[in-house]
């Protein structure tokens, strides 16, 4: 819906429902608002004999609720962005949440310290974009406008309870590049639906009305949400605990992007079919796949114009042991990308840095190429710009940003979905800041330092915490490598300000547990960078290639030759401060000048 008056309508609602006698009604409702935590279990288990009480309607949830008010306590379930409970209505954004705020006093009822602290602020500190299962129960929300936003006669106003649930945004979804992981979304929605039903039971709700559940603005596949809801109802036995369970998932502006079928039509079709969540996930994984150029660039040899070899790669990919597996990343700024990292984390690849490096999409990054190469799925990218494996001795960074911290090592999963592979690439900032690579002998300064301040000890703590929390996951530890820039490849960066070579830090990784160590055994290891550390798009390609070579689980291994870069005469190693002074700022990004490939014949 696009309405230039949405801001005025919402402002009118706030003014109408915060003053006078109507303000008393709002404050009374707000005083009874509850924040319901995750994994809520109701002590009430009401039972009804209902043979046909689940419906999918092409209608507005408020209007559906109005028709059922006389037949028991009714609640409308609304999925919203917990970081903006107004839905942008005060800024004039025409979202579903904004429309509901314009039609009722829902926003003034939710605008309380209890909700801001226990729901809004809490959501800002989640470690992934799917958010939590926390809910807000809002009693007696008054609806006074109709679906066309016209003020109804006061005798037609009505009150209905509401349950606000966080919409699970897909990674990259808020930066226009949504990444779809069917297994994760299915698990997240099922868990959220169960918490909603338990909350409704605790409040003695008889009729429960769902809105679009996030498949409108979030554009999550309606079929997936329908299957998740159906299985949640079946597993919890909720069909016999409510008089009516209604899905009102269609409004005039809730249309499929293709225009072929409404969201409600696709939802209804999937809801009343027999396809299970496992069958749906398998069907998604078996969809036709065309490898992007960025993935094919990992493979040695002339493959971009070789259709038969591309076909062989697609078959190998579908049968390799990592196909369909869940990958999590633990890294620093090199592994960040706008929209793909936890809320509140500092990100390097965003805005102007993306323009400088030519890294805009997941398929441009080293980890995106690698995951697609093996046919896996991104689970969590827990990467933070500037973070180190160790605690910061200087105190300029909080301890919880360190790779060895408990906060980062236990947040590599989403709900019930655990990682199959965890890839660690960190340490460049430890090297840059001059952290102790190992505890030196006869050094009084280092004698009293905590283990978390010494790199090899911190790396061991990090890997140990990860392996204890995720005992079934493979852990791939990537060693540090040098870098160079295309404008002057003779400059090599390998020593920090204390004169310590980055190779010293790799020793700490290799001693940290018996897990897969990805060693870069290249003749001239390194990648193209924009500033001596952060790779540009060509550097991302080389980096992904080196990880695959280092892990040595390859497509057509007999045809893989070690990636031999051009030979350069290496000048004396420079420390980071010297390097920054002599760095040629006129770095040309060859990616922007290269014509698109036509790799399929």
Regions found by a protein language model. Give the residues of each.
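Charged helix-capping and loop-helix junction motifs
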Residues: 222-230, 455-460, 492-497
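A short helix->loop->beta-strand "cap" motif at the edges of active sites that frequently abuts
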Residues: 242-243, 376, 470-475
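Catalytic His-Asp segment of secreted/periplasmic serine-dependent ester chemistry enzymes
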Residues: 480-601
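Macrodomain-like recognition of ADP-ribose-binding/processing modules
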Residues: 1-208, 212-295
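N-terminal secretory targeting modules
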Residues: 279, 287-362, 372-373, 417, ...
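Conserved SGNH/GDSL esterase-like catalytic core that processes O-acyl groups on lipids
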Residues: 337-440, 444, 448, 486, ...
């Amino acid at each position: 819906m696009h309405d230039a008056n949405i801001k005025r309508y919402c402002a009118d609602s706030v003014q109408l429902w915060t003053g006078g006698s109507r303000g008393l009604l709002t404050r009374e409702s707000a005083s009874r608002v509850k924040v319901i935590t995750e994994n809520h279990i109701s002590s009430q288990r009401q039972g009804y004999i209902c043979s046909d009480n689940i419906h999918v309607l092409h209608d507005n949830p408020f209007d559906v609720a109005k028709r059922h008010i006389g037949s028991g306590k009714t609640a409308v379930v609304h999925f919203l962005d917990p970081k903006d409970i107004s839905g942008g209505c005060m800024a004039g954004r025409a979202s579903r949440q904004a429309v509901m705020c314009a039609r009722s006093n829902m926003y003034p009822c939710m605008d309380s310290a209890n909700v801001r602290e226990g729901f809004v602020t809490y959501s800002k500190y989640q470690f992934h974009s799917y958010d939590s299962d926390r809910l807000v129960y809002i009693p007696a929300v008054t609806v006074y406008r109709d679906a066309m936003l016209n003020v109804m006669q006061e005798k037609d106003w009505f009150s209905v309870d509401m349950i606000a649930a966080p919409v699970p945004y897909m990674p990259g979804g808020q930066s226009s590049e949504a990444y779809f992981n069917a297994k994760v979304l299915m698990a997240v929605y099922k868990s959220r639906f169960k918490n909603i039903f338990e909350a409704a039971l605790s409040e003695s709700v008889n009729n429960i009305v769902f809105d679009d559940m996030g498949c409108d603005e979030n554009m999550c596949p309606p079929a997936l949400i329908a299957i998740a809801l159906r299985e949640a109802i079946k597993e919890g036995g909720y069909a016999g605990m409510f008089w009516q369970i209604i899905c009102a998932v269609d409004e005039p502006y809730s249309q499929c992007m293709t225009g072929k079928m409404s969201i409600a039509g696709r939802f209804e079709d999937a809801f009343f079919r027999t396809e299970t969540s496992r069958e749906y996930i398998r069907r998604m994984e078996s969809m036709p796949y065309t490898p992007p150029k960025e993935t094919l660039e990992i493979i040695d040899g002339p493959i971009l114009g070789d259709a038969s070899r591309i076909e062989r790669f697609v078959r190998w990919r579908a049968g390799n042991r990592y196909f369909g597996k869940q990958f999590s990343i633990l890294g620093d700024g090199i592994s960040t990308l706008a929209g793909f990292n936890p809320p509140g984390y500092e990100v390097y690849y965003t805005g102007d840095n993306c323009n400088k490096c030519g890294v805009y999409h997941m398929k441009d990054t080293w980890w995106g190429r690698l995951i697609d190469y093996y046919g896996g799925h991104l689970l969590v990218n827990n990467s933070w710009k500037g973070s180190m494996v160790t605690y910061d001795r200087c105190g300029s960074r909080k301890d919880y940003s360190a790779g060895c911290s408990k906060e980062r090592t236990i947040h590599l999963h989403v709900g019930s979905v655990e990682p199959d592979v965890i890839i660690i690439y960190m340490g460049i900032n430890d090297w840059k800041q001059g952290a102790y690579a190992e505890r030196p002998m006869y050094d009084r300064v280092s004698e009293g330092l905590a283990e978390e301040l010494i790199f090899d000890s911190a790396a061991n703590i990090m890997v140990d915490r990860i392996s204890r929390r995720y005992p079934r996951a493979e852990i791939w530890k990537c060693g540090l490598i040098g870098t160079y820039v295309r404008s002057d490849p003779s400059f090599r960066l390998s020593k920090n300000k204390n004169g310590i070579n980055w190779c010293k830090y790799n020793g700490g990784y290799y001693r940290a547990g018996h897990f897969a160590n990805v060693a870069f055994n290249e003749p001239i290891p390194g990648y193209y960078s924009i500033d001596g550390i952060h790779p540009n798009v060509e550097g991302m390609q080389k980096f992904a290639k080196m990880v695959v070579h280092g892990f040595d689980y390859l497509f057509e291994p007999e045809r893989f030759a070690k990636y031999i870069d051009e030979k350069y005469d290496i000048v004396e190693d420079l420390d980071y401060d010297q390097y920054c002074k002599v760095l040629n700022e006129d770095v040309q990004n060859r990616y922007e000048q290269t014509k698109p490939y036509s790799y399929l014949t």
